[in-house]
Each structure stands twice: as structure tokens, then as C-alpha cells.
Curated annotation (Swiss-Prot):
Species of the source: Gallus gallus
Protein name: PAN2-PAN3 deadenylation complex catalytic subunit PAN2
Known catalytic reactions: Exonucleolytic cleavage of poly(A) to 5'-AMP
Similarity field: Belongs to the peptidase C19 family. PAN2 subfamily.
Region listing for Linker, in residue ranges: 368-485
Subunit record text: Forms a heterotrimer with an asymmetric homodimer of the regulatory subunit PAN3 to form the poly(A)-nuclease (PAN) deadenylation complex.
This enzyme's EC code(s): 3.1.13.4
One cellular component (GO) term of this entry: P-body
Keyword flag Cytoplasm: yes
Length: 1197
């Protein structure tokens, strides 16, 4: 350890501290010292440095082994042997650090730590290296990357650090305190006051911390409290160095003589058992550094600044014969260190050189060192020679250049055939010795090949939907995962990257440039996000569910309406369907159908999402049909207005989707049975012909045979009184307004059918655009292709990409004849009905949505939707009148071309659901939304808890005369419990990455009056009953205890989440302003979208940009002289405190005479918080800075 305060080469230190050393020896002040010295900055000694080429080392004796240069002419300030790897670290006065590997001192890394200050101490860790400068502690990797950078006050002057354990560090200097830093959080955890300032050296034993002071004293401090236990006054001048071993403490330093300092040649030795000085040790050199080198004996290495080195026993006499001299380039030794193995010594001099001494040529710095990572060597640009005639030479010897163009290997497998190499000729020796028996020949092994040498073939992976090979345009990563790079980036599964700030610094605008709202995917069973968006953009469905409200706690119609309301309010910010999915998980039918997924199944991709979303589509339509068909009156919610849709018992879902069908069963005995039913969707049925090639079908043909289905099956015949082969046919009696089609592509057979039909449609489209006669089954010749692209022939070249993989039309025409026969044909968006067509019996359907399954083996696949957004929604959301197709991939929303919505590359993009809506659908329905939530939701209601009593009530409900108006203030606070712990992983560099955040559920919501005679009195204090398992009640922070949310044993006012949610929705709709602390998180967990002008968040009112957020507890203590949140949190207390803070904010911001007065108040707040480490002091330690509450106490309950 170097006491740098005595080195005259440092200009900022007073030279009077060490007058014995002449300042002319400083190379900074006297450049003539460097005139005859010439050094290579890479560490190779040149002329002028006398370094022996071969060193003879006697075993057991230290001799110079190697010398290297850190930086020419810049004095070395500190050296340190790495405690984990075979490296020596050197820092200099220019703030530059260099590491050398092994006993040969090969330069490993070199980088700048500080641009202005010198490096004063180095400490190696497992994950990096700590560098201490005057006002800065920096941790860097061994390669030079910054891990963290801890800045201290400019008034600090740090000199020493001590690693007390793997994660705690003490830092001291010339000031009167020592700082304790937690290396895990990189935060100051404690500050110890020092009676005698100027700690420049620190050591540690199993009993004490040892601190060396500039005054010449050594203090022994308690390991836990840092309190001084003993103190030794070693020297009258100053302390230079000391070391501790066992029960001995040895010091060297300077004594005051004739108004100056002189180096004392007596080493002071102290016995730590008796805590007193023993016989001092006299040496023959001026000691400046000393270290114990305990091997067989407790030897001391004593170094002078002029380069003399003496070894002696601390209890014996120093022998002049044991003095050695370091061959320094500069005149002064600036630093000294001993390796952990005690086999190597390191000296740094004033000319930037480091000298390694060792007791053997094969020296190791540590007893057990881990392997050091080296940089990969540079790849030589010359390409290897490849002999084409050699069969076993791999072609991969020559790397393929990176290119974005299509390679020859990208040619589709359907247009090429494998051409294997010809078999190698048979060895002539085998032919010469071969004997034949009939047509079989055999010969002895000539032993010219290695054993078991066979051609290696890669295992071919079969993909269910991949009948021909495709590879991406770029060759990067082809072998690793080709399917990943086939999927366009916008179709890949999107994930939220969580940081320390959660979602605050995640840029959702990067994924969504529109004003439409996406949906977050991290919630369990959020695979249905794309279908929620499809239903939302069906205007009649959206208006229906937003007008619907009933008394059922878990009603999907109600929750869907509340979610749609948030999507209406959002201006591009994503929403989350947590409440809807919470209700969805409670429905028994959903669980019975296998629609509730476990987290493991959803994450690993074990579920066929295409089949799952089709089942979910059938379930949600049926569920909405049942829920909206229920009678009003007893089932209507007490705060709901009347619906604008239809009469009692009528379902708009039935009007939109329901189709009455007639099922006829004909037994071979001649008995016919007819049964009438209704269906909400149809499933495509594909022909089961085994003919090759597959016939050419239009989509309308397949759709007709799927609707009017005919099949042979075994059924019970009442006439025959047994199961008989029966022909079952299905016919429809009416057409729906919205035609929903499940594509049912669940195997390679259906995928091949789609692919083949798309190829037929591709050829028809090309011939139609090129003016050729369309003939089914005719292939286009090469000459026809050339004519299609030849402008002289008169044909316009069609966009091939727009025609690929398209089979389904953008519109279809359906007609029901008088005989109830169905006609279906493909139609065009631009085509209109002829005058002869009856609008009542002829329907034109336009494609409005497609849901596709994205196949991706790495992420488990995902579901996305293409939705055609109409003029009505565009006008309301963006103020424009047009139609546009959009891709909805959770929170990624992007406009796409209409052709892309119907293009299905079956190798990665598989169709799942199609929605066709009748043209001019919106004109048939009343699309007026009447808010069904009325003021009666705020009136008193009964508690679900059986043990709750009126005397325990913590709130007074609003009276009709107190109903809030627009602009009224309401104090709000919410408490939460944890349903699922967060999922995180530790990366190889030690950092923590959050994969999935913890799932929170609201447990208590409190609203207090913000004005009037009862200001501060709560009118809502609801505990939310939950049926889900709670893993952590967070009692310390929420005040919620086990049993508070259980209706059987709770004594609280317990309600359902839906009931309290409707109260908050009513307050939002009225226009009240919510005042609270951290409301952004509260509204997010409650799943509410609140306009920004209705939110007053005190966490932002008292905040300076780019500074930390301040807790409610500290703000209440500082401004209001209130002590809150003692043992637990109370939401009533927090809501009241937030209101008082807002009043205080208005007083400070509007009452000041200068506009900068409030900013001065905030600066004073942050300064006070920094001094107190943002902890509210105890009552007996420090009084609050303010006195008196902002307004009188609120009415007690």
C-alpha cells in the first residue's frame, strides 16, 4: 500500500509533508530526468533500460524476473496482484490502468479509468476490478468495460479502500468519515464518523479494522460498529505504511525533527495480545513500504523509496547482508505489492515501469487461479485452398460472404432435384483380390481406410406443415434455426423487456405508430388477444357489450364491455385484459373445453394455438349469446341503465352470427328425420379425395360444401330400432349478418390442400391479368411467362408477391333461392349487386378479419390478426375517412396491404379463423352507446363478509346530495397482493433479467372526499374478495392480512372487484380528479384507463427530472410533520396524506412571489433526503423541518 501523501511528484499535495525528498526528482517538474531514457510503450525494453536478458534465480531468494512498461514517463501510483487470475494490475498518475498476464508480464489489457485524477488503489473481485480515484469508485471488467461508476462529492479526497466481505466495501480518505458501500446495489449503506481525519491505509484481521492516519496514529476499530477500541501513536510526524500478521503490528513512518519530517529507521512493533509496543526494529535503509511475507517464518519486506529492499524477522536484528537493490529506471519506487501466494513481489517506479521479483522461474501469483479469457486471434483474410477432386473436403472451408441477395441454394426444392456425388471408384486392390460366387464378390480388407469411416448424414427434421424446403434471403443463422428467419419480423412473438423501472422505460411507440390500442401479452391466457381485437372492431358487438351490465360477478359480456371502453379511451397506449381474463378463468365451461392454459404449456408451446383459438372462438360467441340473451329486471345490475339493443330476451349476438339450419337424416329404410337448430359459425370441410394431383377448387365451392354438409354416418333409427348407415345433410334457412369460419387446418393434409389451391389461384390470376384464356389444370409455359413480363406484347407485369399464397377472396356473394338452396361464388370488393338481385335474399360479404397461427419452434408460436378497420372507427379515432387493413400482434400494430391479409405461407403462417361481414352492416344496427353505469353504484351496499359489523365500518357512503361533479377532488389509494411471483434469470455477467413480472391483484381500494365539510372522510373502503390463490399478502406494505379477503372469516367490508370497479368507472365518467401517490401503478393493476387530465399524482408534483422518486412517507414527514406508514400501510391514511400534500403543493407553487421559489423548495427537499439517506428519522433523533398540518384534522369515524 502506497501512502501517496508523502510523494512529492504529486503537485496537489503540499511538499512540506516530506521535505527529505527533493522535488527535482519529480519527472513532471524536472523533464531532464527523461532525456537519456527511451522506452517502448508496449512494454518491450529498448536502449537505455538495463534489464538482464536471462536471470539466474536461486530457490528461496527473491530476484528480479521481468520488467514491463505501463506508460512511458508517467509514474506508477499503485500495483495489485489479481486475487482470482494470474494477472498484475498497475495504475498510474494519469488515471490509466494496465494489466499484465503471468510471470512473463504479457500485456493483457490497457484502458483509461479517469481522465484527470490518479489511481490510488486497486482491488480485484470475481466479476471485475475496483479502481479508486480522488472522488470516484469505478468497477470495470478485466477487459475494460464499465460495470458501474460511483461518483462521490467533489469535496471528498479518497485514498484507501478495504473489501470487508464479498459485497461490502469501506472507503476512506482525508475527510472525517468512512463510507460503507454495498457492491450489489452500488449504494452507500453507512457513513462512519472518524474522530481523527486522514485515513490513508486500511487493513483487516479477524478481530479489528486497522486504520492508518496521516497524523502518525494507528486506530483499531470494532468490526461491526467501527468504534475505536485501541489506538497507537506510532510517529510524531506521519505514517508511511504498516502491516498486520497474527498478533504483530509493524509500522514505518516519519518523525518531526527541526521543524521538518525525517524518515525514521526504527520500525515500531506492537503486540496485539497485550496491546502495547515491544522492542522497535532498527533497519539499515529508509523504510517507506513494508509487508509481511509469511512462508516458513514471518519475514518482513522493507522497501525504501530509492529502491533498496531488506528482508528481516520482526523480532530479530536486521542484517546488512540481506539488502537488495531494485534496478529501477526512474529514481523513486512509488508502489509495492506482494502476491497472495507470497512467491512474487511487484515494484512500480516513477518512470512508469513495473518490476517483478520472484523466488522461482515458474512463479504463480495465486494458489488456485481460474483460467483467463483471451481475445480471439484475428482471422487471416487469405482463403484456404480447396481441392475439388477430394471427396472428403468440406465446402464450408471457404466462408460464404454476407449478403442480402437470394443465393442459388435458396432455389425452392420443388424446382430442383438432388444430384449426389458419384460413388468413389473401388480400390484397385479390392478388385484385384476379389473372388466371386455367382453375382456376389468379396475381398479381404486392404487396410487402406480408417475403421468406422462412413459418410455423415444430418438427421432430417420433419415439419408438420413443411412439404418443401425454404430458407431466408440472408444466410446468417440458416443452420441454427431456419424457420425463425422465414417469419417476417413483425409477425414474430413480441415480448416486453422489463428493466429496474418496470415498464416505464419500455418504448411501446416503437411497435405502434397508430392511435389504436394494443393488448399486453404477459397475462396468463392472453393468447386470445387477437380475437378480442376482432370482436372490438365489429361495431355492433362493441356497442352491444358496452351497453350491457348485469349482476353476475364473472360475466364475460360485462368485462368485455369495460375492456372495450379502455380501448376507446386509449390514444396508442397498450391496455391489458387482466380483469376479462380473470373472469374467463372462473368459467367452468372454459376449463372443461381445455381453454385455460397453464403457464408452462403457454411458454413451451406444447399447445396447438391454431386449434385452441378456434375452440375459443366458438366458446366466446356461445357465451356472449347466452349472457346477452338473459332477461333484464332481476338480472339487471342495480346501477345499470336500460339497454338500447332489442327487446327482452332478444340477443344481438344471435342476430349477427346465428344461422338457422335444418339437419336431415335419411335411413336406408326410407325414414327421414328433420331437426332444426342454430349455429354461430361454420367449420371448413375439405374433400377427402385421394386423387393426385388435387383438383382445382374455388374457395366458394369449399365454403358451400362446408355449410351444406353431406356425410354418411351410423345413427339410431327409430323405425329399424338399431343403428343404421344414415345420410345426414345440412341446409340453411337464413343467412347470418356476420359469417364466421373456422379453417380447421390442423394437419399437413389440410395444409397441402391450401397450398395446392393457392398455386392454382396464382396461375389463374396471372393468366387473367395477362389476357390468357383461363383453363383449369393448364400450366404456364416459360414463353408465356416471358410474354407476361414483356411490355412490347402489351401486358403489364403483375406483382408476383401480391399473387402468391392467395386462395380466399376479399368478398363472397351468397344467395338463398326460393327452394332454400344456397349459391356461393367468389366476389370482388368493387363489384356491386345487379338490379335483378334481391337485397333481402342476396348477401355480399366483405372480408373484415383473418386470424392466423404463426409457426415458430423457438418461441412456441403465436397468434396474430389482420383486421380491416372501417371508416366509422377511423373517423372517431384519427379524424380521417378511409378503410385500411392492420396487423395486430399483441401491442404491435402496423398497417398492411390487403393482399398480405389473405396470403398464407403454410410453412409458417397458417389460417385459423375468417370473419366475413355483410356489406353495409352498421346501417342495420343502432350503434349508440348509452353508459349503463349510474350514480346508484355509489350508494351503500351490503358486505359479502359474514362477520362484518356496522360498528367496524371505516367509511361513510355518499349521500345523493354529495354526488361528485366534474372537477371535484377524490383522494385514492389502493393496496395489492401477489398471485404469482416474478420469473427472473441471472445472466452470465451477474445481472438480473426479469422474464415475467409478478402478477398483482387489487385487495383494497379507498376513496376519500376531497372537499366539503367532510373533507378527508372516506366514502369507499372496499376489500376485494378473491377466489384465486394468494402467494404473498405483502402485509408490511399493504396492511392486508390472511383472512381479510375470505368472505367466511373476514371482518372487513368485502365486495367483488366488479362492484368497486364500477364505482371508479362512474367517478371517471363524471370527470372527478383523482389525487394520490403512485397512481399509475394503482390504475394499471386495477385495470383502469384514466385520462391524464383527471390524475394528480403527488409523486410527480414533488419530483425533479432525472432524480429519484420520493416516497409518500418522506414527503409527509418533510412537508406535513406527519409520521405515517409505521408498521404497515393504511390506504385511508395514505389517501388523506396525498390530499394534504396536494394542498401544500398549491400553497408552495402558487403562493411564491418568484417562479423559481418552488424549485428551491424541491432542491432543499432533495438535499435533506440525501443527507438522511431518504429515511425518516426517529422522533428522539431529529425533529421534522415543518410544524403543523396543512388543514385541520378530518372527521373521525
Amino acid at each position: 500500500m502506497n501512502f501517496e501523501g508523502l510523494d512529492p511528484s504529486l503537485a496537489e499535495y503540499a511538499p512540506t509533508l516530506h521535505p527529505a525528498l527533493d522535488p527535482v526528482l519529480d519527472p513532471h517538474l524536472n523533464p531532464s530526468l527523461l532525456q537519456n531514457v527511451e522506452l517502448d510503450p508496449e512494454g518491450v525494453p529498448l536502449e537505455g533500460i538495463a534489464v538482464p536478458e536471462s536471470v539466474h534465480i536461486v530457490e528461496g531468494m527473491y530476484s528480479e524476473l521481468h520488467t514491463a512498461v505501463s506508460e512511458v514517463g508517467v509514474p506508477v501510483s499503485v500495483s495489485h496482484f489479481d486475487l482470482h487470475e494470474e494477472m498484475l494490475w498497475v495504475g498510474n498518475h494519469g488515471g490509466h490502468a494496465t494489466s499484465f498476464f503471468g510471470p512473463t508480464l504479457e500485456r493483457y489489457s490497457s484502458f483509461q479509468v479517469n481522465s484527470s485524477d490518479d489511481i490510488r488503489q486497486i482491488q480485484s473481485l470475481e466479476s471485475g476490478v475496483l479502481f479508486l480515484t480522488k472522488t470516484n469508485l469505478k468497477c470495470m471488467s478485466r477487459g475494460g468495460l464499465i460495470i458501474f461508476d460511483y461518483l462521490m462529492d467533489e469535496a471528498e479526497d479518497m485514498h484507501s479502500l478495504l473489501l470487508t466481505d464479498s459485497s461490502t466495501l469501506l472507503v476512506g480518505g482525508l475527510q472525517n468519515h468512512v463510507i460503507e458501500i454495498d457492491l450489489n446495489t452500488v449504494q452507500e449503506t453507512q457513513k462512519y464518523t472518524v474522530e481523527v481525519p486522514g485515513i490513508t491505509i486500511m487493513r483487516q484481521s479477524n478481530r479489528f479494522f486497522f486504520c492508518g492516519h496521516t497524523s502518525g496514529k494507528v486506530s483499531l476499530r470494532d468490526l461491526r460498529t467501527f468504534v475505536v477500541e485501541h489506538e497507537f501513536d506510532a510517529y510524531s510526524g506521519s505514517l508511511s505504511d504498516f502491516d498486520v500478521h497474527g498478533n504483530l503490528l509493524v509500522t514505518c513512518g516519519f518523525s518531526s525533527r527541526m521543524n521538518g519530517l525525517a524518515c525514521d529507521r526504527f520500525l515500531k512493533v506492537y503486540d496485539l495480545r497485550m496491546m502495547r509496543a515491544t522492542t522497535p526494529l532498527q533497519v539499515h535503509i529508509d523504510p517507506f513500504f513494508l509487508r509481511f511475507i509469511p512462508t516458513y517464518t514471518s519475514r518482513l519486506a522493507i522497501i525504501s523509496q530509492t529502491g533498496q529492499c531488506q528482508f528481516c524477522e520482526p523480532t530479530g536484528l536486521a542484517n546488512p547482508a540481506d539488502i537488495f537493490h531494485v534496478n529501477t529506471v526512474g529514481p523513486l519506487i512509488m508502489t509495492f505489492d506482494v502476491s497472495a501466494s507470497k512467491q512474487a513481489l511487484a515494484f512500480g517506479d516513477s518512470e512508469g515501469c513495473v518490476h517483478l521479483w520472484a523466488d522461482s522461474p515458474e512463479v504463480t501469483f495465486n494458489t488456485y487461479s481460474r483460467e483467463t479469457d483471451f481475445a480471439l486471434p484475428c482471422i487471416v483474410d487469405t482463403l484456404p485452398h480447396l481441392d475439388w477432386n477430394q471427396d472428403l473436403v468440406p465446402l464450408s472451408l471457404i466462408p460464404v460472404p454476407l449478403t442480402s441477395e437470394t443465393l442459388l441454394s435458396d432455389w425452392p426444392a420443388a424446382n430442383s432435384a438432388p444430384a449426389p456425388r458419384r460413388a468413389p471408384p473401388v480400390d484397385p486392390e479390392i478388385l484385384r483380390t476379389m473372388k466371386k460366387v455367382g453375382f456376389i464378390g468379396y475381398a479381404p480388407n486392404p487396410r487402406t481406410k480408417l475403421r468406422n469411416q462412413i459418410p455423415y448424414r444430418l438427421k432430417e427434421a420433419d415439419n408438420e406443415f413443411d412439404s418443401f424446403s425454404q430458407v431466408p434471403e440472408s444466410p446468417i443463422g440458416r443452420e441454427e434455426e431456419p424457420h425463425l428467419y422465414m417469419v417476417a419480423k413483425k409477425y414474430r412473438k413480441v415480448t416486453i423487456k422489463y428493466s429496474k423501472l418496470g415498464l416505464e422505460d419500455f418504448d411501446f411507440k416503437h411497435y405502434n405508430k397508430t392511435l389504436f390500442a394494443g393488448l399486453e401479452p404477459h397475462i396468463p391466457n392472453a393468447y386470445c388477444n387477437c380475437m378480442i381485437q376482432v370482436l372490438y372492431f365489429l361495431e355492433p358487438v362493441r356497442c352491444l357489450v358496452q351497453n350491457h351490465l348485469c349482476q353476475k360477478e364473472f360475466c364475460l359480456g360485462c368485462e368485455l364491455g369495460l375492456l372495450f371502453h379502455m380501448l376507446d379511451l386509449s390514444r396508442g397506449d397498450p391496455c391489458q385484459g387482466s380483469n376479462f381474463l380473470r373472469a374467463f378463468r372462473t368459467i367452468p365451461e372454459a376449463s372443461a373445453l381445455g381453454l385455460i392454459l397453464a403457464d408452462s404449456d403457454e411458454a413451451t408451446g406444447k399447445v396447438n394455438l391454431g386449434r385452441l383459438i378456434q375452440s375459443w372462438n366458438r366458446f366466446i360467441l356461445t357465451q356472449l349469446h347466452q349472457e346477452t340473451q338473459e332477461q333484464e329486471g332481476p338480472q339487471a345490475y342495480r346501477g345499470a341503465g336500460s339497454s338500447t339493443f332489442g327487446s327482452s330476451g332478444d340477443s344481438v349476438i344471435g342476430q349477427l352470427f346465428s344461422c338457422e339450419v335444418e339437419n336431415c337424416s335419411m335411413c336406408r329404410c326410407g325414414k327421414e328425420t328433420v331437426r332444426v337448430s342454430s349455429t354461430l359459425l361454420f367449420t371448413l370441410s375439405y374433400p377427402e379425395s385421394a386423387e393426385k394431383p388435387v383438383k382445382d377448387y374455388e374457395f366458394a365451392q369449399i365454403l358451400k360444401r362446408s355449410i351444406c354438409l353431406e356425410q354418411n354416418t351410423q345413427a339410431w333409427c327409430e323405425n329399424c330400432e338399431k343403428y343404421q348407415p344414415t345420410v345426414q345433410t345440412r341446409n340453411i334457412r337464413c343467412l347470418p349478418d356476420v359469417l364466421v369460419i373456422n379453417c380447421e387446418v390442423n394437419s399437413s393434409k389440410e395444409a397441402d390442400f391450401w397450398k395446392t389451391q393457392a398455386e392454382y389461384a396464382f396461375q389463374r390470376a396471372l393468366m387473367k391479368r395477362g389476357g390468357f384464356e383461363i383453363t383449369k389444370g393448364k400450366e404456364i409455359s416459360l414463353g408465356d411467362w416471358k410474354e407476361l413480363g414483356n411490355p412490347e406484347v402489351g401486358h403489364s407485369y403483375p406483382s408476383v408477391e401480391e399473387l402468391k399464397n392467395i386462395w380466399i377472396p376479399h368478398a363472397i356473394k351468397m344467395r338463398l333461392t326460393k327452394n332454400k338452396e344456397l349459391d356461393v361464388c367468389n366476389w370482388s370488393e368493387s363489384d356491386e349487386l345487379s338490379p335483378n338481385d334481391d337485397p333481402e335474399s342476396v348477401y355480399v360479404y366483405d372480408l373484415m378479419a383473418t386470424v392466423v397461427h404463426i409457426l415458430d419452434s423457438r418461441t412456441g408460436g403465436s397468434l396474430v390478426g389482420h383486421i380491416k378497420v372501417g371508416e366509422t372507427y377511423h373517423q372517431r379515432k384519427e379524424g380521417v375517412t378511409h378503410q385500411q387493413w392492420y396487423l395486430f400482434n399483441d401491442f404491435l400494430i402496423e398497417p398492411v396491404d390487403k393482399c398480405e391479409a389473405v396470403q398464407f405461407d403454410m410453412s409458417w403462417k397458417v389460417p385459423a379463423i375468417l370473419y366475413y361481414a355483410r356489406r353495409n352492416l352498421n346501417s342495420k344496427y343502432n350503434l349508440v352507446i348509452k353508459n349503463p353505469i349510474e350514480a346508484s353504484v355509489l350508494l351503500a351496499e351490503a358486505s359479502l363478509a359474514r362477520k362484518q359489523r356496522k360498528c367496524h365500518a371505516t367509511f361513510i357512503p355518499l349521500m345523493l346530495s354529495e354526488m361528485p361533479q366534474a372537477g371535484d377532488l377524490v383522494g385514492l389509494d389502493a393496496e395489492f397482493v401477489t398471485l404469482n411471483e416474478e420469473e427472473a434469470e441471472l445472466r452470465s455477467d451477474g445481472t438480473k433479467s426479469t422474464i415475467k413480472p409478478s402478477q398483482m391483484s387489487v385487495a383494497r381500494i379507498t376513496c376519500v372526499r376531497g372537499q366539503g365539510p367532510n373533507e378527508g372522510v372516506p366514502f369507499i373502503d372496499d376489500y376485494i374478495s378473491t377466489q384465486e390463490q394468494v402467494v404473498d399478502y405483502l402485509t408490511q406494505y399493504s396492511g392486508i392480512k390472511p383472512g381479510d379477503l375470505d368472505a367466511k372469516i373476514s371482518s372487513k367490508h368485502l365486495t367483488t372487484l366488479k362492484s368497486t370497479y364500477l364505482k371508479l368507472r362512474f367517478l371517471i365518467d363524471v370527470g372527478v380528479k383523482f389525487v394520490g401517490h403512485g397512481l399509475q401503478k394503482d390504475f394499471r393493476v386495477i385495470n383502469l384507463m384514466v385520462p391524464k387530465d383527471q390524475v394528480i399524482d403527488t409523486v410527480y408534483l414533488f419530483h425533479i427530472p432525472r432524480k429519484r422518486m420520493i416516497s409518500l412517507r418522506f414527503l409527509a414527514w418533510y412537508f406535513l410533520d406527519l409520521k405515517i406508514q409505521g408498521e404497515t400501510h393504511d390506504s385511508i391514511e395514505d389517501a388523506r396524506t396525498a390530499l394534504q400534500l396536494y394542498r401544500k403543493y398549491l400553497e408552495l407553487s402558487q403562493g411564491g412571489s418568484e417562479p423559481d421559489d418552488f424549485r428551491k423548495v424541491l432542491k432543499a427537499l432533495y438535499e435533506k433526503g440525501r443527507k438522511l439517506d431518504w429515511k425518516v428519522p426517529e422522533p428522539d433523533s431529529q425533529s421534522s423541518p415543518k410544524h403543523g398540518a396543512v388543514f385541520p384534522p378530518v372527521l373521525a369515524l
